Amino acid sequence: MQFLGRSISKSIRPSLNSTARKSWVLSSQQFLSTSSTESSSRTRGGGGGNRAEKSSEEWPRPMEVPYQPKIANSIDLIGYVHQPVQFDSTLDGKFWAGTVISHEPSSDSKSESDSSSNFWIPVLFEGDLAHTANSYLKKNDRVHITGQILGDVIQSGANSDQAHVQLFKSFHGSFSHQVMVRDLHYIEGSKAMPKVLPTLDQNEGVLKHSASVQRGREFGTNLWFDLVDKPNEWCDYREMKQNGSVNPKHPDFKKKDGSQALWLNNAPTEILSELKDVKFDIPKYAKQPKAGEESWKDLVDNMNKWWDNRVDKRTPKSPDFKHKETGVGLWLSDSPSWVLEKLPPPKSKTSDIYGVQEMF
C-alpha cells in the first residue's frame, strides 16, 4: 500500500505544483481565508459541523453494575461433543463426568495436521448432571452449554492426545482451563431427544441440571434399582453410621462382594420412597452397650482391661477409652464428675502393649 501511495503521489505532483503556483498570485489574506474555509468544510463534513465539534459526552458512558461472583468467568457456548463422555465417582459419593467440546464435528478421516486448527474446550459435569451427560451425550452431538471457567495448570510436555488422556483420568490437568457446566441443552433440530425424558424437555430440547435420573439401565443409575431389586446382595450401613460404629463417610449401602458402594445423598427421589419397604442385611458388629456408672467404675478399677486412646485417637469422634473384650466405648465428655481426678495420666496404646513405663 505504501508503494502504491508513492506512485500515485508522483503521478499527480505536476498538477499540484501548477495549482500551487496559481494560488500564490492571490493576496495572502485571500489565500488564508480560502484555506481556512476549505479546511473547516472538510473537517465538519460540509454543512453538519456541530456533530463533529461535540465532545465524547454526546455518547453515554457504560453503566456500572455490582460485582456478582456467580457470573464471574461465565461462559455460554454452542459446540459439538468431541470425545465420548467419561464417568467416575469418588469415595465420598460425588459423581463426575467429563468430555471435550469442539467448534466443529470431529471426523475420523481428518489428518493430524488438520487437528491443529481445532478449538477444544474441556467440560466437567457434577452430580445429577454427570449422570445425565453420561446417559445421553454421544460423540458429535451439538449442544448448548452454560457454565463457569475454572483455571488449571498445563502439564509441561503434554501433546493434545496426552492432554485428553490426563483429563479423562482425573478431570483435572493438561488443559489450562476447564468449564464446570451449569446447564446443558440440545440444539433444536440437531438430533432427537431421548424418549425417556419428560415430554416438556423433548419439546424444548433441554437437559437441565435438576433433571431427575430416569430408570435407564446406565452405570450410576441402575445401581440404585439393583439395590431395590436385589437387596439380598447389599449390606445396609445406615444405622451404623448413625450410632458411630462406622466412619460418617462410609457408604450407606455396599455390595457384599465389595464391588459397588452407594450414598443416600446421591439417590434419586423415587428411590428414597422405595427404600422404606425394603429389608436389607445388616453387617454383624459387636453391639456396644450404653456406658453407665458401672463402666466408669470398671475403668477406674481395672485400667488394664481398657484401651487408653486419649493420646492417639483415630478421629475426634473416637472413644477415649475402649474395653478390650466387650468393645464398650467411653468418652470423657460424658464422664461423671468424680472420674477425672481418679484417672491416671494419658498412656498410649503402644506403651500399654509393650509395657513401656513413663518416666516422671
Curated annotation (Swiss-Prot):
<dbReference type="InterPro" id="IPR012340">
    <property type="entry name" value="NA-bd_OB-fold"/>
</dbReference>
<keyword id="KW-0677">Repeat</keyword>
<keyword id="KW-0809">Transit peptide</keyword>
<feature type="region of interest" description="Disordered">
    <location>
        <begin position="28"/>
        <end position="64"/>
    </location>
</feature>
<protein>
    <recommendedName>
        <fullName>Protein OSB4, chloroplastic</fullName>
    </recommendedName>
</protein>
<feature type="region of interest" description="PDF region 2">
    <location>
        <begin position="296"/>
        <end position="344"/>
    </location>
</feature>
<dbReference type="InterPro" id="IPR000424">
    <property type="entry name" value="Primosome_PriB/ssb"/>
</dbReference>
<feature type="compositionally biased region" description="Low complexity">
    <location>
        <begin position="33"/>
        <end position="43"/>
    </location>
</feature>
<dbReference type="GO" id="GO:0006260">
    <property type="term" value="P:DNA replication"/>
</dbReference>
<feature type="region of interest" description="PDF region 1">
    <location>
        <begin position="224"/>
        <end position="276"/>
    </location>
</feature>
<feature type="compositionally biased region" description="Basic and acidic residues">
    <location>
        <begin position="51"/>
        <end position="61"/>
    </location>
</feature>
<dbReference type="InterPro" id="IPR011344">
    <property type="entry name" value="ssDNA-bd"/>
</dbReference>
<feature type="domain" description="SSB">
    <location>
        <begin position="71"/>
        <end position="188"/>
    </location>
</feature>
<comment type="function">
    <text>Binds single-stranded DNA.</text>
</comment>
<keyword id="KW-0238">DNA-binding</keyword>
<keyword id="KW-0934">Plastid</keyword>
<feature type="transit peptide" description="Chloroplast">
    <location>
        <begin position="1"/>
        <end position="61"/>
    </location>
</feature>
<dbReference type="GO" id="GO:0003697">
    <property type="term" value="F:single-stranded DNA binding"/>
</dbReference>
<dbReference type="GO" id="GO:0009507">
    <property type="term" value="C:chloroplast"/>
</dbReference>
<keyword id="KW-0150">Chloroplast</keyword>
